[in-house]
């Protein structure tokens, strides 16, 4: 089998590549933002906004994992039109390339942020969304991307799988994510800032557990299905700050006003993924944080005070 991974040089994408190679699957990384972290994969500097390049880059591929997107909600808020273009049109371009080259599957990276548009507090893959509740352009781009997958299946017969990620953490995290920010502040002697009262909860999912789901999603049972890939423990932002403080010390916590449109968290069930493709998270939050802090100190400890 030959697969392509858009965004394969990124935080999650690089771990997906690792898990695929562990299974001896041939991988082509499609990414114009950097180079792969390993040399046993093909690399094409493909821009997902360039349909011709994308068509050529996916020729001879069986399955494409589509992870390339504007994933930082702050960047989406700062540039909504550019984010809509990349996240929505980019997904359409990937689906069109799959149609052109008759790929066996498109596996889409989505997010539990889509449940911000659900009225229910306890949610699974079958809940309906209310457009009036999306609350953030990022949420809307992900719902639109999922809808395009369904449309391309209905209209053109392109099979898909949607993976709705919980909040990922672990080695290779982007510097702009909350855990690396907290770690830099802790070792820099600055207080960690927490939005609101810190009670916002997510089931943070360790990145290697998340990456495992991408291999399991190749199963025939996953075709044309959507799965929540979320952690097993409810973790508040305040607990993250307290954990970083415990592991790294620092000046403690400072509370600031909440962000507009922030996803407040839902009770997300991942039982469908456990039942149908055998996925469950294995790394608990404390163990994952210990690994993440160890990676951070090993790779960025000398430069953490002045990140690029």
Q: How does the language model describe each region?
A:
Residues 78-93, 100, 105, 114-162, ...:
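Catalytic helix-loop patch of NAD(P)-dependent Rossmann-fold dehydrogenases
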Residues 6, 30, 64-67, 106-112, ...:
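SDR active-site strand-loop-helix element
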Residues 25-34:
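Conserved glycine-rich Rossmann-like NAD(P)H-binding loop of the short-chain dehydrogenase/reductase
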Residues 186-308:
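C-terminal substrate-binding subdomain of Rossmann-fold SDR/epimerase-dehydratase oxidoreductases
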Residues 40-50:
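Rossmann-fold cofactor-recognition segment
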Residues 3-23:
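N-terminal Rossmann NAD(P)H-binding glycine-rich loop of SDR-like oxidoreductase domains
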Residues 48-86, 97:
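NAD(P)H-binding glycine-rich loop region in Rossmannoid oxidoreductase-like domains
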Residues 75-76, 128-135, 158-171, 182-205, ...:
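A conserved pocket-lining segment of Rossmann-fold NAD(P)-dependent short-chain dehydrogenase/reductase
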């Amino acid at each position: 089998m030959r697969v392509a991974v858009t965004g394969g040089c990124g935080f999650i994408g690089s771990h997906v590549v690792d898990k695929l190679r562990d299974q001896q699957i041939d991988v082509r990384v499609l990414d114009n933002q950097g180079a792969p972290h390993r040399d046993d994969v093909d690399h094409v500097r493909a821009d997902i906004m360039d349909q011709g390049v994308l068509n050529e880059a996916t020729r001879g591929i069986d399955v494409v994992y589509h992870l390339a997107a504007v994933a930082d909600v702050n960047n989406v808020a700062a540039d909504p039109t550019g984010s809509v273009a990349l996240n929505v049109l980019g997904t359409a371009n990937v689906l069109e390339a799959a149609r052109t080259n008759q790929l066996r599957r498109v596996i889409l990276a989505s997010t539990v942020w889509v449940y911000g548009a659900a009225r229910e507090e306890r949610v699974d893959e079958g809940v309906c969304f209310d457009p009036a509740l999306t609350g953030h352009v990022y949420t809307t781009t992900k719902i639109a991307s999922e809808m395009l997958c369904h449309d391309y299946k209905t209209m053109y017969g392109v099979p898909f799988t949607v993976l709705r990620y919980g909040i990922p953490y672990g080695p290779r995290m982007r510097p702009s994510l909350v855990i690396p920010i907290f770690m830099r502040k802790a070792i820099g002697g600055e207080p960690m800032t927490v939005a609101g009262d810190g009670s916002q909860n997510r089931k943070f999912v360790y990145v290697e557990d998340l990456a495992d789901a991408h291999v399991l999603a190749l199963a025939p049972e996953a075709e044309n299905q959507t799965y929540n890939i979320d952690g097993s423990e409810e973790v508040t932002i305040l607990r993250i700050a307290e954990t970083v403080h415990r592991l790294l010390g620092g000046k403690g916590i400072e509370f600031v006003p909440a962000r507009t449109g922030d996803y407040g968290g839902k009770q997300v069930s991942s039982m469908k993924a456990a039942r149908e493709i055998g996925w469950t998270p294995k790394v608990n939050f404390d163990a994952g944080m210990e690994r993440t802090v160890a990676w951070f100190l090993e790779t960025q400890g000398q430069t953490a005070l002045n990140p690029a």
